[in-house]
Amino acid sequence: MATPNPATGLGAIATGQLSVVGHALPWAIAVAFFFLAGGYLSFGTQVLIWILFALSLDLALGYAGIVTLGQAAFFGFGAYAAGLFAIHVSSDPILGHLIAVAVTALFGLVTGALILHTTGVTFLMLTLAIVSVMFEYANQATKLTGGDDGLQGVNIAPLFGLFEFTMFGQTAYLYALVVLFIWFVIAWRVVSSPFGRSLDGIRQNPRRMRAIGTPVWWRLLAIYTLSAAMAGSAGALSTHATRFVGLSVLSLFTSGIVAVILILGGIRRLYGAFVGATIYLLVQDWSAKVSPYFWEFIVGLMLIATVLFLEGGLMDLGRVMRSVLGRIRKADSK
């Protein structure tokens, strides 16, 4: 998929070229949703979690060109780490979250060091193998993970000892929103830095970057580890919000969903994860009420249309519409 010019249309969000109002708008909407959502806060929390998960994939795939099918391995690792820590060590959500992020980052560092020496189909198959092995291990290790029944009995203490994680979802939503904002700022600073620009060079031409002395492997390992930590954070948020870890967090289907979300929203856009996750989950929620399988058909059509007509995902919709309207005006003037 070709990369649209980030300086045009909504793509400017990704490179910090929008006004302060433009940057603040998505966050203002998220805050307003907290007050207006009513009984949909739990749904909103899931949207925030998937945004963070998609953002983690965007760092690896979009900005560094690391094509992976195994992002669910880090999401699931973080989810199980947070759940097991809450059961066996401490139910404090912040401490559990930090531990989950740390161990997932370490897992990403180790696996990245092993597989980033490879490229192309070999690398893709290795990421596939990692998530498949983890899924099977979690399925078989019933005493540790609960197997197919999932990890149950995860009790989460009140946040700061004051705010309970209730069924209404207020605490979980605000907690997820703050965590997402912190990670977004980190991601934005990374992609806007000289390090981020070097990743863009590596994505386009790794041989040339090596020729000018760039430590390509080390930089890929660094962004791969950061991507893993971010995905692990999303997994930990999922555990804290639902107090349950299902085996599906390690499934290939989960890796596929996050890839679809990113493609729908727009790769290398940062805010593309926001658009993609919101649209995907809204369509899923709406169409699933009509038929349990109908939503997959709708999402499939959206994905095909996005790939064919919107090179930059739904984030590119405004630019495409302006282009079409411009052509219509020119045709009318003739």
Task: Describe the residue ranges of each PLM region.
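Transmembrane alpha-helices and adjacent helix-loop boundaries
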Residues: M1-K334
